[in-house]
Amino acid sequence: TRPEELAITETELKNAETALDHAEKNLQETLLNSYTKADDAVRNQADQLFIEPRSGNPDLVFSLLDQNSYVEPDFDSTDGILIEVESRQIEKDLMVWVGKLNTASVAEVTVNLSKIKGFLDRLALITNALVEVIGLTQATIDDYRGAVATARADINTAINNLFTATEELNNAEASLALVRRELSLDQAGSLPQVILAQVAKVNQAKAKVAIIEAQITGGRIVAP
């Protein structure tokens, strides 16, 4: 391998190391942003549908049983209870998450986002089925649907961003490993050439010594 080829590979190595550093920082930033989006989706959007959502005993702001004269199929008596229980659990998850914000792994954040997505998807099924009744206007229903839609969009964005950042890191690690292997092969390939060059110099020196010895033997010294 020629020196200029080695120089090119060494430059590629530096670029790959820079790309990996960027990917690592981007992933860390994405993990932090995931919490921000999750917090906004739950506490600024979905919590509008609950009374005292952070109290440990949240209640929906509307009664699902009031809807059963108007919707098909009817809401089950446990639908409201289950979504309220899930809301309470999501609040607990967010509190745990923020406590380890700088150390949460990709796997942990992925699980958190997945839980919130499932919660919001089920909440959307409820709000999309709501109809106007006494104490619940269509404008209010539209507000609830809009809040849940915004929350779901936030979470989907967070999930997609995390996937992209993880893929970028994986690709950067693979690229760096490849360049390191190429550089190792290039350096190994240059070794025989270096040895041959040194051997040639040694042989050349030996030839000069042989000429001098022959001239001495002949009784005269002539500059080689």
Q: Which stretches of residues belong to each language-model region?
A:
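Extended amphipathic alpha-helical segments
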Residues: 2-26, 33, 157-223
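Long, amphipathic, heptad-repeat alpha-helical coiled-coil stalk/linker regions
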Residues: 16-169
